[in-house]
Design a protein with these regions (language model features):
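Flexible beta->alpha loop and helix N-cap segments adjacent to enzyme active/binding sites
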Residues: 1-174
């Protein structure tokens, strides 16, 4: 059978173990992920992403890093494990690739219209990201905020060398 995958881009070797990413995220750091094959399409799915906990302080930091207006109509996208999704969102369709909108039930973040372009991860769809989320869940955090790893007006980063060339890497871990 033919299997769909959005991971068609350049492959990158692991920069840090999932445990290291999880520790940094739990410490309220924003991490840059360059992991596995790059995503194809108009969104970042965790392999070329900036990830953080959904706190007001982190959202403010992301707005500065991404050079966004604080009242941007484009909210950041949440990622959670399949096992946690029903707790936080009204799910009507599978959301492995951020192609559907889910209404927010409750949670540590809000959007202007109570909707989110959600990505739901299961153990088989993205083992790396599922592992990071699993470690976060054990620390009481079950949602990550995700945005593409690029600077304003630029394409998504493909390689570590690309990342080093853009201006958003100051103070970020990868």
């Amino acid at each position: 059978p033919i299997t769909f995958t959005p991971y068609l881009g350049i492959r990158s070797s692991r920069q840090m173990a999932p445990e290291e990413y999880a520790k940094k995220i739990i410490n309220n750091e924003i991490v840059a992920v360059i992991e596995g094959q790059a995503e194809f399409g108009p969104r970042a799915l965790g392999n070329r992403s900036l990830l953080c906990l959904p706190t007001d302080a982190n959202i403010k930091k992301l707005n500065i890093i991404k050079d966004r207006d604080k009242d941007s109509w484009r909210p950041y996208a949440p990622i959670c494990q399949k096992e946690e999704a029903d707790k936080w969102f009204h799910i009507t369709k599978a959301c492995p690739y951020m192609l559907h909108i889910a209404k927010i039930k409750s949670g540590p973040f809000n959007t202007y219209d109570n909707s989110a372009r959600l990505q739901i991860i299961d153990r088989n769809s993205n083992t790396f990201l599922w592992s990071v989320l699993d470690m976060l869940r054990q620390s009481g955090h079950s949602i990550l905020i995700n945005t593409s790893l690029n600077s304003k007006g630029k394409p998504i980063v493909n390689t570590v060398d690309d990342f080093k060339e853009i201006q958003i890497h100051d103070g970020l871990c990868y």
